[in-house]
Design a protein with these regions (language model features):
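Small-residue-rich anion-binding loops in enzyme active sites
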Residues: 50-66
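Electropositive phosphate-/nucleotide-binding environments in soluble metabolic enzymes
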Residues: 15, 61, 73, 158-162
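Metal-dependent phosphoesterase signature
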Residues: 61-97
């Protein structure tokens, strides 16, 4: 079978997951101190990145590793309420029409579509339901005594995306012809999944991915980002 792997933030959606969660907690007046502390601690790293004191890889890995803090102490059913709100109020409205149409074309051709993202796997499952996508690969949340611990079991980032995707394909018994399959991503951090297939597509790429894709003759969808 032929598969099509889609990244989320910046690729399928313009809204970033952390922005969507911030919007939820702000509008519902919940966990305001926790969210402010999280944003203050992590946004403050961006100037350090520009000064060369924190690598871009470390900056984004810290975000993905620490995002589960926002849900610490919540029960899974409380989490589902948040994931549904984020999906319906933030992610679905921010779908890129052209990329969503590409996804639908893959579905119409009978290709196996998989969402592959650093976002929480439970959130991706909610979005997958709305889009008719059965399989997702994301960051798995740890539970402790029936509540979210604030830690990730396995963050889904960079090369780990390929390992987790391979695990999913084997677990579900999906025999995919990778040489004929497609992958869509917007960031240089998506390169491992893009190179995993025969048809990589850079979508509204950052500068590094734009250059990387151009050198290799990959298809590019949308205007490249300048930053």
């Amino acid at each position: 079978m032929i598969a099509a792997f889609f990244d989320l933030d910046g690729t399928l959606c313009t809204e970033h997951v952390w922005q969507a969660f911030n919007k939820y907690f702000t509008e519902h007046h919940r966990r305001r101190l926790l969210v402010k502390a999280f944003l203050a601690t992590h946004l403050s790293l961006w100037p350090l990145h520009h000064l060369g004191l924190v690598s871009r890889t470390r900056f984004f890995r810290l975000w993905i590793n620490h995002m589960p803090w926002l849900l610490v102490g919540l029960r899974p059913e409380e989490g589902q309420e948040i994931f549904r709100w984020v999906t319906d109020q933030a992610l679905i409205p921010s779908l890129r029409p052209d990329v969503a149409e590409v996804l639908r074309q893959h579905q119409a051709q009978g290709h196996q579509v998989v969402l592959v993202s650093g976002a929480f796997e439970e959130l991706l499952a909610c979005l997958g339901e709305r889009l008719g996508v059965q399989h997702v690969v994301g960051t798995r949340l740890e539970l402790n005594r029936g509540r979210y611990s604030g830690r990730a079991i396995k963050p889904c980032f960079g090369p780990d995306k390929v390992a987790l995707l391979t695990e999913l394909l084997a677990k579900r018994g999906l025999e995919v012809d990778l040489s004929q399959s497609f992958s869509y991503g917007d960031s240089v951090f998506d390169v491992p999944v893009l190179e995993f297939v025969g048809n990589p597509v850079a979508v509204y790429p950052d500068r590094q991915l734009r250059d990387y894709a151009s050198q290799r003759g990959w298809q590019i969808i949308g205007e490249p980002k300048e930053s």
